[in-house]
Curated annotation (Swiss-Prot):
Enzyme class per UniProt: ligase
Function: Cell wall formation.
Protein name: UDP-N-acetylmuramate--L-alanine ligase
Enzyme Commission identifier(s): 6.3.2.8
This protein's pathway: Cell wall biogenesis; peptidoglycan biosynthesis
UniProt xrefs under InterPro entries: Mur-like_cat_sf (IPR036565), Mur_ligase_C (IPR004101), Mur_ligase_C_dom_sf (IPR036615), Mur_ligase_cen (IPR013221), Mur_ligase_N (IPR000713), MurCDEF_pg_biosynth (IPR050061), UDP-N-AcMur_Ala_ligase_MurC (IPR005758)
Gene: murC
Family: Belongs to the MurCDEF family.
Length: 449
């Protein structure tokens, strides 16, 4: 059965709202957006983060760490998923009988009166959301990553139209009130939330699509190709004449879409053209075609997605890909980029698996995803994301790559140091290196830890 959200009778934009865990990417996005909508915002977290600094600069009062004294006369408390019932601020809010909403429940109250372009899928949703927000600059945007166009995960706006990155991992996408539902793929993941029931998992996607007034789907997906209700459909054959270029040193994909002409979008790979095409098709009723074509050029990528950190003797790329399908697609992009640069360097991959559950569920696919375009594989310890450690013999499972196992990687100037037991065992001074993972590898590659 599908969950029913807790509903707050008051409009959140008229409320005093306290966010517990305000530094997280999801919660900070809601806080930034609601402040722009007129709400009075306060918050707390356990540590300073870039989002906390940004909100403080806007005048938002934020307590570090959590403090029950911060809870006084607010109309509602919104907390992130990791906040537990025994949190001191949660306990104080209960004493004062202040309504408490999880982020998931708050979504419905925030979005119920909005014209939401809701993007959901296993892969590509951050990119599509950022591309569509570039195409429609008057719309608000809440993205699960930082758009380089406006250097934030949120574009604050008083506009009722909103581009929103929805999340299937906790089924909160069902609370996103989609005016337009945009789905690139439905590859099963996060099945633990759906009790490993595929029927329940796909029913959630069907419900999401059914409740939108407008639907944009990629029909090469095995589930979406059988979706029967009216939808704007993208098929692989609709995208043609794909070419890759460097423009002012930056990578771009050129392609033609249906009978709409040629488009140019930042980034490389067929998947990049597919993501851009879904964003374009979603905007056809919003802007004229030339505005769409020109505005798409404002998309400059998103942080941690084929994020080119440096391009000198050592080309260094950070990518959030943490699923075999994503890794395989991004490695193809890396090979295209290497060819455009006319470098003869081999592609070195540093991989940090994210969550034992994902690694075990997709182990056979992980064992294959590096076969193409990876010349050397370096493996970091699994990033558990608070999961209980599980025994898995990575050396045995990945022996066909003859991988290098290290404890961590450290950025030092323009070089990378590989460490085992806090000893530097190798320094990479030149070449082509791409890091994959959704854990702390991004901070290791950036020299931030």
């Amino acid at each position: 059965m599908l969950e029913t959200p807790k509903v707050l009778l008051k409009n959140l934009q008229d409320c005093k709202i306290h966010f517990i865990g305000i530094g997280g990417i999801g919660i900070s996005g809601l806080a930034k957006y609601l402040k722009a909508q007129g709400a009075t915002i306060s918050g707390s977290d356990i540590a300073i983060s870039p989002s906390v600094k940004y909100l403080k600069a806007l005048g938002v009062e934020i307590n570090i760490p959590h403090d029950p004294k911060a809870i006084n006369n607010q109309d509602v408390i919104i907390h992130s998923a990791i906040i537990k019932e025994d949190n001191t601020e949660i306990q104080r809010a209960k004493e004062l009988e202040i309504p408490i909403l999880s982020r998931k429940d708050a979504l419905y109250s925030i979005l119920k009166d909005k014209r939401v372009f809701s993007v959901c899928g296993a892969h590509g949703k951050s990119s599509i959301t950022a591309m569509l927000s570039a195409i429609c600059p008057a719309f608000g945007a809440i993205i699960g990553a930082h758009s380089k166009e406006f250097d934030s995960n949120v574009r604050e706006s008083a506009n009722d139209s909103l581009v929103f990155e929805a999340d299937e991992s906790d089924s909160s996408f069902l609370f996103s009130n989609p005016f337009c539902a945009i789905v690139p793929n439905t590859e099963p993941e996060h099945l633990e939330h759906y009790d490993h029931d595929l029927e329940r998992f796909f029913f959630a996607y069907e419900y999401f699509l059914d409740h939108a007034q407008k639907r944009v789907i990629y029909k090469e997906d095995p589930f979406l190709k059988n979706y029967s209700k009216d939808a704007i459909v993208l098929e692989k054959k609709d995208i043609y004449n794909i070419q890759y270029i460097l423009k002012d040193g930056e990578p771009y994909t050129s392609f033609e879409l249906k009978d709409l002409g040629a488009f140019l979008v930042w980034g490389l790979g067929e998947h990049n053209a597919t993501n851009a095409s879904l964003a374009i098709l979603s905007a056809l009723d919003e802007l004229n075609l030339e505005e769409i074509r020109n505005n798409l050029l404002n998309f400059k990528g998103i942080k941690k997605r084929f994020d080119i950190l440096q391009k000198n003797a050592l080309i260094l790329i950070d990518d959030y890909a943490h699923h075999p399908t994503e890794i395989s697609a991004t490695l193809k992009s890396a090979r295209i980029y290497a060819d455009l640069l006319d470098t003869q360097e081999k592609i070195v991959v540093i991989w940090q698996a994210h969550k034992y559950s994902r690694l075990m569920d997709n182990l056979e696919e992980f064992k294959k995803c590096f076969l193409e375009h990876c010349d050397r594989l370096i493996i970091l310890p699994v990033y558990s994301a608070s999961e209980v450690k599980r025994d898995i013999d990575l050396k045995a499972h990945f022996k066909h790559y003859n991988p290098t196992f290290i404890d961590r990687v450290r950025k030092k100037g323009d070089f990378l140091e590989l460490l085992v037991n806090d000893n530097v065992v190798e320094t990479i001074e030149k070449g082509f290196v791409i890091g994959f993972g959704a854990g702390d590898i991004t901070y290791q590659l950036r020299g931030e830890m």
